[in-house]
């Protein structure tokens, strides 16, 4: 009789669920934005600003972007863990991915919330 010992951190289910949840958030936002563009297509900069000047739209956009970046992090981390076997290179690449995603999140927030002042 063979006894099977299951070890590991069981990140697979959590990652799978996080990717599905972030995908649903992105799909809902995309459908919302598509509906807005179909109902009232923006033709100039003032129309674009009108769409994104509402606080709820900026919050929804930021939630979309955080979901996008979290989704990207999970995917990139899994790709790097699966295909980059040298620990030093993998760690360096993961740090670069994290730093770039943090930078893009802050930059996106700055763009979204700076619209209020413009």
Residues covered by each model-derived region:
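Membrane-embedded alpha-helical bundles that constitute the cytochrome b-like, heme-associated redox core
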Residues: 1-118
């Amino acid at each position: 009789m063979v006894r099977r010992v299951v070890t590991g951190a069981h990140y697979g289910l959590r990652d799978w669920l996080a990717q599905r949840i972030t995908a649903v958030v992105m799909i809902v936002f995309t459908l919302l934005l598509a509906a807005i563009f179909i109902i009232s297509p923006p033709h100039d900069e003032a129309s674009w600003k009108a769409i994104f000047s509402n606080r709820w739209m900026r919050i929804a956009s930021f939630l979309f972007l955080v979901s996008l970046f979290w989704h990207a992090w999970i995917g990139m981390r899994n790709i790097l863990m699966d295909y980059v076997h040298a620990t030093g290179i993998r760690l360096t690449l993961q740090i670069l991915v994290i730093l770039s995603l943090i930078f893009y999140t802050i930059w996106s927030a700055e763009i979204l919330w700076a619209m209020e002042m413009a």
